[in-house]
Each structure stands twice: as C-alpha cells, then as structure tokens.
Amino acid sequence: MGKIIGIDLGTTNSCVAIMEHGKPVVIQNSEGGRTTPSIVAYTNKGERLVGQVAKNQMVTNPENTIYSIKRFMGRRFEEVASEIKMVPYKIEKGLNGDARVNISNIKKQMSPPEISAATLTKMKETAEAYLGEKVTEAVITVPAYFNDAQRQATKDAGKIAGLEVKRIVNEPTAAALAYGIEKKHEEIVAVYDLGGGTFDISILELGDGVFEVKSTNGDTHLGGDNFDDEIIKHLISEFKKESAIDLSNDKMALQRLKEAAEKAKIELSGAQEASINLPFITADANGPKHLQYTLTRAKFEQMVDHLVQKTKEPCLKAIKDAGLKASDINEVILVGGSTRIPAIQKIVKDIFGQDPNKGVNPDEAVAIGAAIQGGILTGETKDMVLLDVTPLSLGIETLGGVMTKLIERNTTIPTKKSQVFSTAADNQTSVDIKVLQGEREMAAQNRILGNFILDGIPAAPRGVPQIEVSFDIDANGIVHVSAKDMGTGKEQKIRIESSSGLSESEIDRMVKDAEAHAEEDKKLKENIEAKNTANSLIYQTEKSLKEYSEKISIEDKETIENKIKELKESLEKEDISLIKSKTEELQKASYKIAEMMYKDSSQQNASNQQENGTQNNTSEEGKEADYEVVDEDKK
C-alpha cells in the first residue's frame, strides 16, 4: 500500500501532512509555506491559479478569484443567501438546485467540489514533490457539523482531484489525534475549532490509544470570515460618514477592504490597535480618496461580541450531550486561526473554567491528525483506534409530516439501525421514503437528504404490510438507506446523494476536465519555457553579433539577422511549434559567432601563454642574477 496523505481542506487555508518513520510531518508547498491559501483564480487568458499566486491578484480580479468556497459545498442555492452577500464572485443556481460559481473569464459555471478539487490537486502535487512518487490516496477532514451532502461534496472534490478518499474525518477529531498521539494516560478533552468559515466543538475521551468522540456540536455558518465582515461593514460605514461615498458596491474596493480587515484582525491578536491605510480606495469629482482608520482592540471586540457569544450555546450542548460537567474536562484544545483572537480565548476560559491548552499548532493540527488517520489505515500507526460520531440525527418522514428518528445524533459510527413501518392507506402498493437529517420534530423543518420509492407492495389494508427501513452510516459519516417489504422480500437500496449533489456523470466529466487542466498546465509551462528560450537566444545572439560583427562575413551576418527577425515575428504570432523551429534555425545560424568566439579565445590563450612564458623566463633569470650578485658580495 502506498502513502496516504492527510489533507486539511480549510475555508481560508489548506495544509497537507504525511507519516514518516512513525511521526507526522507537515509538507511545505512550492512557495515555502506550510499552509496554502484555499483560493482559486482564473485570469483573463483563462489560466488557472491556485494558492498564494491566486491570492496575490485578488484585488485586481475580484469576480474571478474564488475564496471561502467551502461555505458553498453541498448546499442548495436557497440555503446560501447570506453567504452570497459576503463574496464578490457570482453565485448562481445550478440545474439541480445547487449553488454554483459563474466564472466570466472562462465563461463557465463551476460547482464548489470542482473548485475545491483545484486546491486538493495543489496539496496532492505538494506531497508528490516531497515524496518523489505518485500519490493517489488521502484522508480529508471536514467540519464535525457538516451534513451528509457536504461530506459527499468533499468526497467528490477528492475524486475530481484524482484522489481516492480513504476516510473523511471530522476536524476536531483529527486535532485530538494530533494532540493525543503521545499521550498515555486517560483524559477528557474538548476541541474548540473556529476556522475561517465554520465552528465545531467536540468532546472526546482519550485513553490506551482509543479516541472516542462523546459528542459534537457546531455552526457551519460561523467563522473568521464573519469577523472580517464586521470590520468591513464598520469601515464602509465610517468612510461613508466622512466622504459621503458608499463603497459597498465597488467590488475592487471591497476586495481591498477584505484584505485590510483580515490583516487588522490578525494584528489585534497581539496589539491594542491596528492602522488601516488604503490610499486611492476610490475617487469623486474632487479627485482620489484615501481610507485611513485606526481600529482598537476594544472597538473590534465590541463589534464581534455577538459572534463570540454564538460559540457558547454549542459548547454547553456538547458538554450536556456527553453527560458531563465543564469541570470534568481535563484539557481544552484550540484549533483554527480564529482561536488566536483574545476575546475567543476569554470565552473559552469562561465556559470551561480553565485556560485553553495552546500546545497544538492551530493551523497544522488538523492536517497532522488526518495524516495519523492515514497511518492507522495503512497500519503504519499502531495501537490507535478512532471512534467518531454522527453530528445530526437521521430519520424518515412518517404520517402527518413528522420526522421519525432512526439514528440519534452523537451515535458512534459506523452504525446500522432498522425499524419496521407500515402503509398509511388501504391498498397502498408503494411508499415514498424521504430521508431526513436534523433535530426538529417536523419533517419540513429538517434537511431532506434524498428520497426513493419502494413499489410492488401487495395491496392490503393499511397497517398490514411490514416495511423494514434500515439506515447504515459508514466510517466517513455517509448515509446508506434501504427499505424492504418483509412480505415479498423486495428491497430498494440507495446511497444518499443530496438533491444538490453531483451525479456520477458530472463527476466523471469534472475528473476529465481536471486531467485536461493538468495537461493544459503542463502545456502552458512548456510554452512559457519555449518563449523564454527564444527571447534569451535573441538577446545573447544580438549581444554577440554586436561584439563580433567585424570578424564574421557579411553573408553570415545577414543570415543571422534574418533568423533573429523571423524568430521575433514567430513570438508575436504565439505559434509555439513555429517558435521552436525558428529557435533551432537561429541556434544553427549563430554557430558562426560561436566559432569566432572560440577562435578568438584560443588565440588569446595562446598569446597569454607566450607572454607568461617570456615573463617567467625573465623572472627566473632575474632571480639567478640576484643570487649571483649576492654571492659575489659575500666572496
């Protein structure tokens, strides 16, 4: 079995790690960073950029630079109204009702898994460059509170990137693995995970290599992006008061504000105030306008207090669901860059009655845990067992629009539960089974994961047919449902694919597109190299021609000048095969200059040797004469 890499596919940043000699190692990317921005961009030439290079051009290309795509994974268009307001790129409704991104530079609508696949491909290539071998398998992490559709979308993204996703692991659980890999004693740990776009809290029991999740809770609409958004709204409001100009509809200005807000938020974790200076943010009839503002930590904490408080309720629920008191928890581990905010650390202390443990790197712990899980699957990491839970209850819609739960939230997975139901009307020959996920009592208030029909039921009075419905959740937290007519033995099975999810044919198309992109990237690199070689040759040849023009024949000089002209013309035409052939022709023609250079060099060397020989002889004679004179004196 080859290496299984561990990937933290984050809202803001992603990270990849691997097990080496029994230890997890975080791998640096090609730019030297240990984390990679989860940003994908398309230039006006249709070139795809991923990571830091994509982030570098965000301000000038806001509508074609996609960040925080994780907020749209596995979600229907009508579910993302608040998220749409937070991004400058265009979100549209897909044919199957899901949220998709319209990228104007390539005139294409793309699904969130397809965009996430570009980041996963970057992580895959980072690992391959480090290992020097092909990577095909991965463990990918997701927020603990991700529903089935969001998990399936993450798995689809892996497939599009050419990865077999061996396991989907909850982020807090992965962080606990990173924390507890060398711990031998038993303890109860809370993992408070506030990332760029999601919040999770998980309570785990650690002991003898067993990592058992007791409960989990969270909010998939709360993260560092929301904190940035509060700063942006405040800056827009202050600027409007000062200059009577509203920046909220200026996409380029918003992108600059986004960058400045994120920078200020980070600064305020270590300083009492942050200066925000954005020259030429906009202009009016009187000329350019500049934004200058000093944001204090006190003001920032006042602005985001409602967000900080939103993390409290999920924590209290998780403690209660685990059957514990806050005082029973031995350690609180902080994960995610947003946990560096002092106000967050304060509320954690208030909730749990203790200072949080800062021994785990909040940016790398999740990827490290994913790599450890990869090691468990390959057998490289021994004596460790991970027992995770399903974050939300699962059930079906029954008579009266009620949700009947078959699997309660926080049930250890993998698990299987069955229950017998019957028909609601006389002579009913089929049943429509709606699969639901959520905690509300009525079906309409929960998320429909999917539905299927079991038909061929023999006509009978209502309540007579016996229909067994079984729910099976695998280790990835993905749901499989079956319904069986006990009388006839007829059975219908489905793996739940969200109504907003991708079909197999769509995934296959996206895999092919991703492979084509890899080919395009390779071709683009070759094209750039061919142009660079041509330009370099033109420069060197022109330089040499100037130096040796008097030493080569007029005929050779004209040939070389013509070949330079032809190569320059081919560069303007952007025809790579022509550029390559004209480069070769110029190389051959320029051999005449090389001959002259070599001849010149040989003559120079011969001349130098002759001069050196004369000098050496003179020197030797001088030495001898001196010696003789000295000798004579002595005599």
UniProtKB/Swiss-Prot annotation:
PTM annotation (Phosphothreonine): residues: 198
Source organism per UniProt: Borreliella afzelii (strain PKo)
Positions of the UniProt region annotated as Disordered: 599-635
Function: Acts as a chaperone.
Protein name as annotated: Chaperone protein DnaK
UniProt feature, compositional bias: Basic and acidic residues: 620-635
NCBIfam families registered for this protein in UniProt: PRK00290.1, PRK05183.1, prok_dnaK
Similarity annotation: Belongs to the heat shock protein 70 family.
Superkingdom classification of source: Bacteria
